[in-house]
């Protein structure tokens, strides 16, 4: 379990939190027919994604934000035991809407999470993984997010680049 060192805003109701704990995912901003989907793994990363979504929405970009609590439930299972725990493709598609573009912002290294979330990967042109780069351990929260390329402005910049490349 990873827990934030600082208090974070409450973004769910009690019922939503229970469902999220059961399913390993929470849709923080639902946007039918989203232009881009931001998937956050980690509380600080979720806050950055929510802020980035607001910036993108100001420019008429339809943006969905997903909080992934248990990335392992979305992996390709390695055996029958994992298959009982992991969601199948049908369930994944029901819980996480298909999207034309995705950005995954994770508190873990991007290489590792890319492998774990292969089933959510739309390919190198349509999915970007933004992971922790092991920088800024003594910085404040905003400094740590910035130095690791996970601030709301960093996410917004990557999203704009992806949107312009994939027109």
Ranges and model annotations:
Residues 2-167:
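Thiamine diphosphate
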């Amino acid at each position: 379990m990873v827990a934030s060192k600082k208090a974070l805003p409450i973004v769910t109701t009690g019922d939503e939190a229970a469902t999220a704990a059961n399913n390993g995912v929470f849709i923080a901003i639902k946007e039918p027919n989203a232009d881009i989907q931001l998937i956050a793994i980690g509380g600080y990363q979720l806050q950055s994604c929510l802020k980035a979504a607001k910036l993108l929405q100001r420019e008429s970009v339809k943006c969905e934000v997903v909080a992934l609590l248990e990335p392992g439930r979305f992996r390709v299972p390695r055996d029958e035991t994992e298959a009982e725990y992991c969601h199948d493709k049908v369930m994944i598609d029901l819980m996480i809407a298909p999207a034309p573009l995705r950005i995954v912002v994770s508190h873990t290294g991007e290489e590792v999470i890319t492998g774990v979330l292969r089933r959510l990967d739309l390919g190198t042109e349509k999915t970007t993984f933004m992971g922790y780069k092991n920088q800024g351990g003594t910085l404040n929260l905003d400094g740590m997010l910035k130095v690791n390329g996970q601030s709301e402005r960093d996410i917004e910049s990557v999203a704009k680049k992806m949107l312009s490349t994939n027109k």
